From Swiss-Prot:
GO cellular component assignments: nucleus
Any GO BP: regulation of hemopoiesis
Motif Nuclear localization signal location, chain numbering: 380-389
A Pfam family this chain is assigned to: Zfx_Zfy_act
C2H2-type zinc finger segments: 411-433, 442-464, 477-499, 508-531, 537-559, 565-588, 594-616, 622-645, 651-673, 679-702, 708-730, 736-759, 765-788
Single GO term (MF): RNA polymerase II cis-regulatory region sequence-specific DNA binding
Organism ancestry: Eukaryota, Metazoa, Chordata, Craniata, Vertebrata
Compartments it resides in: Nucleus
Task of the protein: Probable transcriptional activator.
UniProt protein name: Zinc finger Y-chromosomal protein 1
Keyword Plastid recorded: no
Length: 794
C-alpha cells in the first residue's frame, strides 16, 4: 500500500464544512477530519525565502499529498530542511471535484456538515463565502511535526490574515479540475536545491481564476468550445472572463515580477457578437482580467531558454464561451495564431520548447487548445471587416496602468509619443503634425488648402484672386522657392523651413493697396476680406481678377496672342490701344505735328485739328461762377464747384464721421461699413472695419518701438520699407538731403517731387480752363482730362 500523509483539519470555528475525497480513506476522529490525499503543493519558509515544493511518497524527507482524480503537476522541487524557521500563512485551493465527491450516505454528510458548521467561524477579511479554516499538520524530519496555519478556499481568491509577526502572507492555488494549474504569488524567489530540477529563481508563475475547463483525464487537451457543467460562471450568472496575459523580459534588479489586475465589466470594444452576449449572459459584457509577468535573463538552467521569449508576449483567453476566438482580433493581427497555448507558467519556463513539458514524475501536462474549426472562420471574417473599417481611422490603442493602479486604454500619438484619453483628442493633436497626415491630391501653392477634386481647387484659386502657379500633385513634391524636388512630404516641409529662416523679415505687399505683412497667410486673408468682391471677372487661364469685363477681355489677349491695334505709320501691332498711342507719340511725333492744346491729341494735318477743336467749343455750355471753368453738363459743373471751391464736407458718415462733398461719395463709403465688424483702437477713438488698417494705425501712431533697425547706424524704423529706403544711404550713392526736414533719398526725381509737394506753396502749372494751379504738369493734365474732357475735345 502506498504511503500517504494525513491532512488534519481542526474545526475550531463554526460555519465551515469539508468534503473528503478518496476511496474509503477518510474518517472523522472527534473534532478532527482525517483526509488522505495523493498530491498537493506546499509553500515553506526557509532563510527568509519562499519556495514551491512538491513531495513524493518515496522520498525520506518529504511528504506527498496527491489528488486521486487528476495528475496535474505544477512544480516538483527537492525538499530539504527548509521547514524550520517560522510559520507560513497561506491559502490553499483544494480541487473542486475532491471537495464535491459523492462519498458516504446522506446522513453521514449531514452529520459531518452540521458538526463542521457549528464549530467553525469565517474570518471577516475573507471574501469567499465557502471557507474552511484549519490547521495543516505535516511531519517534519527534525521536529517530527510542523503545523502550517492557513485558509482552505473554494473558487475565488481570499486575503490571508497574518497570524504572527514574522509570518509571510502568500497565496497558493492548487488548480481544481475546471481551472488551469497555475500559481500566483508576488516576488517569491525559489531556492535551487538540485541542478536537475527546474530553476524558478527568475520568473514567477501567475494565477488565472477559471482559466479553462480541464477534463477529468489530465492528459487530454482542452478546447475552447467545450462547456463543462458546474462552471462557476454559469452557476452564479456571471459573465465570461477575458484573461489577458502579458509576459515581459525583466530588467536587471527588478523585484516586482508580476501581478494580476481585475478589470470591471469590459466595453464592447472586444467585438463579441450581440447574439453571444444575449444568449449566454443576458446582455452583460465579459469581465476582463489582465495578468502580467516578467522573466529575467539570468537563467542558467537549460530547460528555461529566456532568449527564445520575445520582449513582449501577449496572449488572451476568454473563459466560459465558445465564441472566444473572435475576441480582440486587432491585437492578434501581427502575430500568428497558434493552435495550442501553454499555461502561463509553462510558457515562461520553457518558451517555445514544448518538448520539455512532458511527463514529470510520471504525470502528464495539460495544454490549452483552441478549437478553430468554427471560431477561426469568424475570426477571419471579422478581421477583414475590422480592417476595412479601420482603414479610415488609423488609430491604435494601448493599455497603461493609471495612478490608481487600474489599467487605462489610451490613444498614443505614433509620431511624438503623447497619450490621450479619447480618439477625438488624438485627432485634434494630429493637426500639430500636418506633414505626417494623409496628403490630398491637389494643393494650393499660395496657402495650405488641399483637396482631392480639381474643381474645388479651381474654385479656391478664384477666391484668392491671385495668379495661380503650377498645381502640384502628390508625386510632384517641388519647392516653390528653388525648384528642388523631394520624395517625401516631411523632407519638403523641413526644406521650406530653411527658406523661411533665410527670408527673415521679408514683407509681402498687396498689389491692390498699401497693405504689407511679413506672413503670406495674413496677406491671403487680407486679399479675401478686402479685395475679393472688387474683382468679379476671373481669368480662367491664370485666375487673375478684374473689375470690368473690358479689362478681362484686354487681359485675355496676353494668353491668346491677339494684337488687333495696328500702327498706320509702321508694322507695329499692339494688344492694347494705349500702347499704340504711346508708340505713335514716341516713334512718329514728327509725322503728326498738329497737337490739341486742351487734350494734347496730335493730328497729321491742320484740318483734322480744327474739326477736333470744334468739339471742345460746343461742350462749354455751363460756366463756373467762381472761375473760368466750363462744363458740358450741370452735374459736372456742380462737382467742380464742390471739389474746387468748397472746403466744407456737408455729408458726414455716421460710423466714422468722415466727410464727403457729394451724397454719392458718402453712399459708396457707407457700403463699406455694412456687414463688417468695426474694430476700435484701444488707445484712441479711431475705429475701422479693416483690422489690418487698424494694426497699421497702432503701429504708426501708438507704438514707440522700432522693430526694424539698421545694422550700420542702429537707426530704428517702424516698417521694413522705411528701412530699405534708409539702407540706400549706405550704398555709396549720392544722397539728396532735404533742407526743410529729415527726408533724404538717392533718387533725384523723388527728391524734387518731395520739395515741390511738401515745401512749395507755389503752383506754377495752371489749368487753361479754370486757372487751378498744380505743382507738376502731370497733375494738370490729369485734372484737364477729368474736369474739362468735353472742352478739350473741341
Amino acid at each position: 500500500m502506498e504511503d500517504v500523509a494525513e491532512l488534519e483539519l481542526q474545526t475550531t470555528e463554526p460555519h465551515a464544512f469539508f468534503h473528503a475525497s478518496g476511496v474509503g480513506e477518510r474518517h472523522l476522529n472527534g473534532n478532527e477530519i482525517i483526509v488522505e490525499i495523493q498530491e498537493t503543493v506546499f509553500v515553506a519558509d526557509g532563510d527568509g525565502n519562499m519556495a514551491v515544493q512538491g513531495f513524493g511518497p518515496d522520498e525520506g524527507d518529504s511528504v506527498v499529498i496527491q489528488d486521486v482524480i487528476e495528475d496535474v503537476v505544477i512544480e516538483d522541487v527537492q525538499c530539504s530542511d527548509i521547514l524550520d524557521g517560522g510559520r507560513v500563512s497561506e491559502a490553499v485551493i483544494i480541487p473542486e471535484q475532491v471537495l464535491e465527491d459523492e462519498v458516504g450516505t446522506g446522513e453521514e454528510e449531514q452529520v459531518l456538515e452540521e458538526d463542521s458548521l457549528t464549530s467553525c467561524d469565517v474570518p471577516d477579511n475573507v471574501l469567499d463565502p465557502e471557507l474552511v479554516d484549519g490547521e495543516l499538520t505535516i511531519p517534519d524530519p527534525e521536529t517530527g511535526m510542523h503545523s502550517v496555519s492557513g485558509h482552505v478556499v473554494i473558487g475565488e481568491e481570499i486575503t490571508d490574515d497574518a497570524l504572527e509577526e514574522d509570518m509571510i502572507s502568500e497565496e497558493v492555488l492548487v488548480a481544481d479540475c475546471v481551472s488551469e494549474a497555475v500559481i500566483d504569488a508576488n516576488g517569491i524567489p525559489v531556492h535551487e536545491n538540485d541542478s536537475e530540477e527546474v530553476n524558478c529563481d527568475d520568473y514567477l508563475m501567475i494565477s488565472l481564476d477559471d482559466a479553462e475547463k480541464i477534463d477529468e483525464d489530465g492528459a487530454e487537451e482542452i478546447t475552447m468550445g467545450s462547456v463543462v457543467e458546474g462552471d462557476s460562471s454559469k452557476l452564479d450568472g456571471s459573465c465570461p472572463e477575458v484573461i489577458k496575459v502579458y509576459i515581459f523580459k525583466a530588467d536587471p534588479g527588478e523585484e516586482d515580477l508580476g501581478g494580476t489586475v481585475d478589470i470591471v465589466e469590459s466595453e464592447s470594444e472586444n467585438d463579441h457578437g450581440d447574439g453571444f452576449l444575449d444568449s449566454h449572459n443576458g446582455g452583460r459584457l465579459p469581465r476582463e482580467k489582465m495578468v502580467y509577468m516578467t522573466v529575467n535573463d539570468s537563467q542558467n538552467d537549460d530547460d528555461l531558454d529566456v532568449a527564445e521569449i520575445a520582449d513582449e508576449v501577449y496572449m488572451e483567453v476568454i473563459v466560459g464561451e465558445e465564441d472566444a476566438a473572435v475576441a480582440h482580433e486587432h491585437q492578434l493581427e501581427d502575430a500568428e495564431l497558434s493552435k495550442t497555448f501553454m499555461p502561463v507558467a509553462w510558457a515562461a519556463a520553457y518558451g517555445n520548447n514544448t518538448d520539455g513539458i512532458e511527463h514529470r514524475n510520471g504525470t502528464a501536462s495539460a495544454l490549452l487548445h483552441i478549437d478553430e474549426s468554427d471560431g477561426l472562420d469568424r475570426l477571419t471574417k471579422q478581421k477583414l471587416k475590422k480592417k476595412r473599417r479601420g482603414e479610415n481611422r488609423q488609430y491604435q490603442t494601448a493599455i497603461i496602468i493609471g495612478p490608481d493602479g487600474h489599467p487605462l486604454t489610451v490613444y498614443p500619438c505614433m509620431i511624438c509619443g503623447k497619450k490621450f484619453k479619447s480618439r477625438g483628442f488624438l485627432k485634434r493633436h494630429m493637426k500639430n503634425h500636418p506633414e505626417h497626415l494623409v496628403r490630398k491630391k491637389y494643393r494650393c501653392t499660395d496657402c495650405d488648402y488641399t483637396t482631392n477634386k480639381k474643381v474645388s481647387l479651381h474654385n479656391h484659386l478664384e477666391s484668392h484672386k491671385l495668379t495661380a502657379t503650377v498645381i502640384k500633385t502628390e508625386k510632384d513634391l517641388e519647392c516653390e522657392e528653388c525648384g528642388k524636388i523631394f520624395l517625401h512630404a516631411n523632407a519638403l516641409f523641413a526644406h521650406k523651413l530653411t527658406h523661411n529662416e533665410k527670408a527673415g523679415n521679408k514683407m509681402h505687399i498687396c498689389k491692390f493697396c498699401d497693405y504689407e505683412t511679413a506672413e503670406q497667410g495674413l496677406l491671403n486673408r487680407h486679399l479675401l476680406a478686402v479685395h475679393s468682391k472688387s474683382f468679379p471677372h476671373i481669368c480662367v487661364e491664370c485666375g487673375k481678377g478684374f473689375r470690368h469685363p473690358s479689362e478681362l477681355k484686354k487681359h485675355m489677349r496676353t494668353h491668346t496672342g491677339e494684337k488687333p491695334y495696328l500702327c498706320q505709320y509702321c508694322d507695329y501691332r499692339s494688344a492694347d490701344s494705349s500702347n499704340l498711342k504711346t508708340h505713335v507719340k514716341t516713334k512718329h511725333s514728327k509725322e503728326m505735328p498738329f497737337k490739341c492744346d486742351i487734350c494734347l491729341q496730335t493730328f497729321t494735318d491742320s484740318k483734322d485739328l480744327q474739326e477736333h477743336a470744334i468739339l471742345h467749343q460746343e461742350s462749354k455750355n455751363h460756366q463756373c461762377l467762381h472761375c473760368d471753368h466750363k462744363s458740358s453738363n450741370s452735374s459736372d459743373l456742380k462737382r467742380h464747384i464742390i471739389s474746387v471751391h468748397t472746403k466744407d464736407y456737408p455729408h458726414k458718415c455716421e460710423v466714422c464721421e468722415k466727410g464727403f462733398h457729394r451724397p454719392s461719395e458718402l453712399k459708396k463709403h457707407e457700403a463699406a461699413h455694412k456687414g463688417k465688424k468695426m474694430h476700435q483702437c484701444r488707445h484712441c477713438e479711431f475705429h475701422i472695419a479693416d483690422p489690418f488698417v487698424l494694426s497699421r494705425h497702432i503701429l504708426s501712431v501708438h507704438t514707440k518701438e522700432l522693430p526694424y533697425r539698421c545694422k550700420r547706424c542702429k537707426k530704428g524704423f517702424r516698417q521694413q520699407i522705411e528701412l530699405k529706403k534708409h539702407m540706400k544711404t549706405h550704398s555709396g550713392k549720392k544722397v539728396y538731403q532735404c533742407e526743410y526736414c529729415e527726408y533724404n533719398t538717392t533718387d533725384a526725381s523723388g527728391f524734387k517731387r518731395h520739395v515741390i509737394s511738401i515745401h512749395t506753396k507755389d503752383y506754377p502749372h495752371r489749368c487753361d480752363y479754370c486757372k487751378k494751379g498744380f505743382r507738376r504738369p502731370s497733375e494738370k493734365n490729369q485734372h484737364t482730362l477729368k474736369h474739362h474732357k468735353e472742352a478739350s475735345l473741341m
